Amino acid sequence: MTKFVAEVTVGKRDRLVTLRIPAGNTIAPSLNQVTVSFDGQTSQHHREPISSTVLEYHPMPGTHRLEIDFGGPMPAATIILPEQTTAIISPIPALHDDATGMLSTAGHIWNPAKPPRQLTQLVSSLFAHNTHLVALSGTFAGLTALTEVPESLFFPLIYASTFTGVFAVSGLTHVSRQLFTANLQAEDFSEAFMGCKSLHSIPAGLFSTNTHARIFDRTFAESALGEVPAALFSNVAKRGSFVETFARTQIKHVPEGLMTDTEPVNIDGMFEPAERLPHDPMNIKAAPVFSQDFFDATRLATGVPTKRARF
């Protein structure tokens, strides 16, 4: 039977470990029973509508094992893990809708409003039982302690088309060029790495197999990027949207060939600079240096690449 298995690292000052499993108006019969084990201390619980199952532990400092077992699948977007959760060490159960019991197409492993911000490690086979997932919207958003992920993390997700905000405001310091290799249906990467303040560079082949990808709005906005690989978009779909893709970063030069053959429909604020200069209403002086071929390749696109239209 598949269980959710995590490691919880407790310090000297944060010894209260709390697990919450909220419920809405309806709970699917297949998800109304849960067994929780903390370092071998096991308890069984019957979940009630409009209430939360709350479990508290007071362990000694160190690393502890937490197991959550719903008897098969687990409810998506529901559990609130202990804030001291540092690792997920086995594949997660299939994600099902908590109210209907049906397969969930959205990859929300925990309650999106309460992510485990101290999480540092994900097992590479995390999604082995969730090949049905379509949308990875905000799945790992806000995980500020997560500095890297396995390059094969998304390999099982052959139907995934949306990666909106998947790592937004996370602590990623680098990403593998293989990260999205298996996601041949991917179309939307908007805000995928937005606000990643420790992400200084990206591989040229990051989207090399994503030939259907066409939405890159704010994908790297407000990240720490200082340069862009010229071949980053060489294989993506034509007529895509690039609104604020690299806005408010430290990029100083737009490489030749970046937008060749992409025929974008919108580049509004694509390279809007983080800083403003006096008497520079279109941010031309503060913006990065563009090669002439950028303007040739985007001449039919809507918007100004150095300044986002405000309405």
Residue spans for each PLM region:
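Solvent-exposed loop and capping/linker segments of extracellular ligand-binding repeat ectodomains
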Residues: 1-311
